[in-house]
Amino acid sequence: MNTYNARLYIFSLALALVILKGTKCYMYVFLQEPGAAFCVDDSGVRYKPGDVWYDDEKCEKLRCSGAEASLKIIGAGCGIIHVVGCETVRGSGHYPNCCPRPKC
């Protein structure tokens, strides 16, 4: 990941968190290298435009979006949930089923 993409990723994630504060999910956009024919995730795996995949460790759904030469990865994940007097229990499976839920 080059410096431009790293900065844009951090900015996009921070902006999404500010906008979506208090909601049950977050979303972010990670722009790919200009002229790229594939989306490349943090693990180096390549995806074609339209591909959807899951990061079960982070409980996120990701999608390679756009046309070649202007591709981006759009990610969605769980928000922060806190209910006083309850514990938080992580779900199972892919996003959104893996999102934590209060257990009272």
Curated annotation (Swiss-Prot):
Summary of the tissues where the protein is detected: Expressed by the venom gland.
Keywords: Disulfide bond, Secreted, Signal
Entry-linked Pfam families: SVWC
Post-translational modification: Contains 4 disulfide bonds.
Record's keyword annotation contains Transcription regulation: no
Stretch forming the signal peptide: 1-25
Main location: secreted
Protein location: Secreted
GO CC field: extracellular region
Annotated protein name in UniProt: Toxin-like protein 14
Species whose genome carries this gene: Urodacus yaschenkoi
